[in-house]
Structures are given as C-alpha cells and as structure tokens.
Amino acid sequence: ISRKDAAGLLELLRDQEEITVTFDAESRVTRNCTTYNIVGRIPGKHPDRMVLLSAHYDSYFDGFQDDNTAVALMFGIAKALLDSGFQPNNTIVICAMASEEWGVVDSNFDWSTGAYEQIFTAHPEWVGKVIADLNFELPALAHGTRARIRSCYEYVSFLEEYLADLPNLTIAYPEETAVTSPIETWSDDFSMAIAGVPSMVNDFTGGSFMETHYHSQFDNDEFYDEQVYRLHHELFALLILALDETAVVPLQFSPVVQRIRKGLEQC
C-alpha cells in the first residue's frame, strides 16, 4: 500500500492493538496479448556453441532493481567485451526476456513465461548448444554480507575454481564471493535449467529489501549501490572469459548423483 494509506492506518492503531478495514482493489487483465523476447549476439568462432546472458525487461512499477539494472548490466558487459576487442570462441547471446513477472492467466505458476517459451517453443535447439545461461536479477543491490553465484549443481566445481583464481575486484561486501546451489524457481534461469541448459544467477533473495520493497512502488533508485553493481559487472564479465576458454564444457555431474542419493536415503 502507499505511504499515505499506511500513515492513516498507523494513526488508527495508535490507541488500539488491532482494527478491521475493508480493502477494495480492482485488477484488470488483458488476455491474449503478445510479448517479445529481444535477442542480440556477439558472433564467436563457433556459432553453434553459445554463452547466454539473460535478464527480464518487464517489471512491477518502475522495477529499478527488478530488473532494469540487470538489463543494463547485460549491455554494459557486452559493450566492455566489444570495446576490448575480444574475439569470443563461443557466440555470446544477450536475451532480454519478457513476461517474467507474469505471463499466464488462471494459473498458480504464472511467472517466467517468456524464458520458458524462449527455450521450449522459440529456440528448443539451444539445448545442447548453450553451454551456460548467466541470468541476472537485482544486481545493483547488496544482498546480505557477500555476493553469491547461485548455480545448478553441475557448475559448482568450476565456479569454485574460478573464484579461487580471481584477481582483486571492486570491494562491495565484507565477505568473499561464494557459490551456492541449487538454483531456485524464482527466476528465468530455472526455466532454462529444466530444459537442459546449465544455468546460474547472481543470488538475490537475501536481505530486507525482499520483504519491504520487492515488487512494490518502492523499488527505485534510492537503493542503488554502485560498488555492488561494479562488482557484478567485473565478476560476470570475467566469468564469460573463463567459460570461453574451455575446450570442453566444464560440467561436473557427481554432485547431482550425490544429491539424488541423499534424497533417496531420506525417503
């Protein structure tokens, strides 16, 4: 609710512990609309082997963090790669996804529709060609005490080795960057992963912002953190370079088997 309405409720609660109110809201849904995923490429020496960068451009209200800064981050990384004269081995695909926040009527599973349709309907041939999806969410905001890359199990070992060999990056958190797994259903990397594309995302679910400002009119530039934003540019641009140097896709399947075994033992 708005600050104005909240102030009125707080005033009513000044002299009593609880009150009963009537909430009157009207939502209008326009059915059968078309949205567009927007795709660009930096051609590589091997056009059929790709690294995908993804972020969604739809939002609730202004969506400054969620997810406009992420779309801008993709452009920033792409510009840095081009300006550096980098000639990738893999084709770098940049995809601004639609319908992440909402895209299906009459369903409990109404989000990440654009990404789902991108990989299952528009480009199912990407499976087996995209060696990694680097998805971005709320990248200009501090989440907890460290940056984290939330990854599918198969990339954890490679990412841990990558982080161990990193040069000094912009200092934005008191603790060192870490890897966590598995991925979650909150974001577009999940739709990619269930199709068979190994995926990861900057971890974004920690911190009070998610409880007080997420998906509200308060998601604006007031919470812009330049140091965190710079760190994510550096962290993922260098990750693209590291992935591009691999002759064989660096997937490690033993963590998946271990997780399956653990799940069976708990049954």
Where are these regions (language model features)?
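Soluble metallo-hydrolase cores and metallopeptidase-like ectodomains found primarily
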Residues: I1-Q65, F75-F86
